[in-house]
């Protein structure tokens, strides 16, 4: 457990360092680009918290199975080491006395055994505390998910919209826009085609996006060419950057409904299709992170 906690503390320090660098970038750029950075920061924090909770739960289960044999294993290991190094009988007797040997000086073994028991009890208490913390974090995630569902239900009811479920496979943004294009404008473009379109636009208008193209794992700013390559060839999640790129390249408005504020409207510089594409942005629907669904009007 000590080793895991040390590793997790280091990971937290690394994350805070990355977040500090990202927050410096929040002072620049437009409102939508700032929102994309803030979403990325929140997602990085949530992902690390969930990762740590899972690691602690796994270690907790493993330690419960091994604690019962720790004392016996420790005794056997030390005695074997004494045989291997051929220490004297007097030295061996001294070590055995400190390791709960009832035959020699009964008071000393009792004291050593009690100290070991206390260490185990402290460790169990710490593990229990960490397990309870993991459960609280899990309950918190469930509460956030339920609260988001309630808010979205009210928002969509008032707007006369209904959500169309899109698979959470890393392509949800592109799949949602693909569904909207086909439904409203009879334009058939799959997720890969939309990935290519957004990457082409970002690459062509790189001056609009430089400094806001982030690596999902490190949170560091990527060169435009590297970022576009990830959008094309990997299941990199789409964000506000891709939404704006697609709105401009497809010449269609995109409206993003969310529970944190008003509808975000991504308007293209020139309009070919007047009817906007409507999608929903979820932060807590899935434990994996952000998710998008397609939205349709009930009277359609």
UniProtKB/Swiss-Prot annotation:
List the biased-composition ranges (Basic and acidic residues): 48-61, 115-141
Q: Where is the composition biased (Polar residues)?
A: 89-109
EC no. given is: 3.4.19.12
UniProt feature, compositional bias: Acidic residues: 62-71
Its Gene Ontology cellular component terms are:
cytoplasm; cytosol
Q: Which GO terms describe its biological process?
A: ERAD pathway; proteolysis
Catalyzed reaction equations: Thiol-dependent hydrolysis of ester, thioester, amide, peptide and isopeptide bonds formed by the C-terminal Gly of ubiquitin (a 76-residue protein attached to proteins as an intracellular targeting signal)
Keyword field? Cytoplasm, Hydrolase, Protease, Thiol protease, Ubl conjugation pathway
Q: What is its main location?
A: cytoplasm
Top-rank lineage group of the source organism: Eukaryota
Specify the signal sequence span. Answer: none
Q: Which residues form the OTU domain?
A: 161-298
GO MF annotations, alphabetized: cysteine-type deubiquitinase activity; peptidase activity
Q: InterPro entries this protein is in?
A: OTU2-like_OTU, OTU_dom, Papain-like_cys_pep_sf, Peptidase_C85-like
Chain segments carrying region Disordered: 23-73, 89-141
Q: Cellular location of this protein?
A: Cytoplasm
- What Pfam family does this protein match (any one)? OTU
Explain the purpose of this protein. Hydrolase that can remove conjugated ubiquitin from proteins and may therefore play an important regulatory role at the level of protein turnover by preventing degradation.
What's the protein called, per UniProt? Ubiquitin thioesterase otu2
Q: Which organism is it from?
A: Schizosaccharomyces pombe (strain 972 / ATCC 24843)
């Amino acid at each position: 457990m000590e080793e895991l906690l040390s590793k997790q503390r280091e990971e937290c320090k690394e994350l805070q360092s990355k977040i500090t660098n990202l927050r410096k970038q929040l002072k620049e750029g437009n409102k939508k680009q700032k929102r994309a950075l803030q979403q990325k920061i929140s997602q990085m924090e949530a992902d690390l918290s969930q990762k740590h909770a899972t690691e602690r739960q796994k270690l907790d289960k493993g330690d419960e199975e091994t604690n019962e044999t720790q004392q016996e294993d420790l005794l056997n290991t030390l005695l074997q080491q004494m045989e291997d190094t051929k220490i004297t009988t007097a030295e061996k007797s001294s070590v055995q006395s400190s390791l709960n040997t009832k035959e020699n000086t009964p008071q000393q073994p009792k004291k050593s055994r009690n100290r070991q028991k206390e260490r185990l009890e402290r460790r169990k208490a710490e593990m229990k505390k960490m397990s309870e913390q993991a459960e609280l974090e899990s309950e918190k995630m469930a509460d956030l998910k339920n609260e988001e569902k309630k808010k979205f239900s009210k928002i969509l009811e008032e707007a006369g919209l209904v959500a169309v479920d899109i698979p959470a496979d890393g392509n949800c943004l592109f799949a949602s826009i693909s569904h909207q294009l086909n439904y409203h404008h009879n334009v058939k473009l799959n997720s890969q085609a939309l990935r290519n379109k957004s990457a082409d636009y970002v690459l062509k208008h790189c001056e609009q996006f430089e400094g806001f193209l982030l690596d999902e794992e490190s949170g560091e700013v990527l060169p435009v060419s590297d970022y576009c390559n990830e959008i094309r060839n990997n299941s990199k999640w789409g964000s506000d950057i891709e939404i704006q790129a697609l709105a401009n390249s497809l010449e269609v408005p995109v409206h993003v409904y969310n529970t944190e504020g008003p509808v975000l409207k991504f308007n293209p510089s020139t309009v070919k299709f007047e009817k906007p594409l409507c999608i929903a942005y979820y932060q807590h629907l899935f434990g994996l992170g952000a998710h998008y669904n397609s939205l349709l009007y009930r009277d359609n």
